[in-house]
Amino acid sequence: MQVLVRDNNVDQALRALKKKMQREGIFREMKMRDFYEKPSQKRAREKAEAVRRVRKLARKRAQREGIVAR
């Protein structure tokens, strides 16, 4: 990953790098790799994440269509 440093402005470059890393999901991956995750736990987590994603999409679609379901 590469970030340009303009006018020796290191703070701005660090902010840009952090934003890029956040977008790429590097921080989340580092947190996940901190400890070993058993394959069965990984499958369960991924399945739960998929369910969460589907529900979130359905909520957004319903809200867009004017149907508010809670």
From Swiss-Prot:
Belongs to the bacterial ribosomal protein bS21 family. One of its GO terms (cellular component) is ribosome. Keywords: Ribonucleoprotein, Ribosomal protein. HAMAP family: Ribosomal_bS21. InterPro entries: Ribosomal_bS21, Ribosomal_bS21_CS, Ribosomal_bS21_sf. The lineage of its organism: Bacteria, Pseudomonadati, Pseudomonadota, Alphaproteobacteria, Hyphomicrobiales. It comes from Rhizobium meliloti (strain 1021). It comes from the Bacteria. GO terms for biological process: translation. This is Small ribosomal subunit protein bS21B. The keyword Ribosomal protein applies. GO terms for molecular function: structural constituent of ribosome. PANTHER family: MITOCHONDRIAL 28S RIBOSOMAL PROTEIN S21 (PTHR21109), SMALL RIBOSOMAL SUBUNIT PROTEIN BS21M (PTHR21109:SF0).
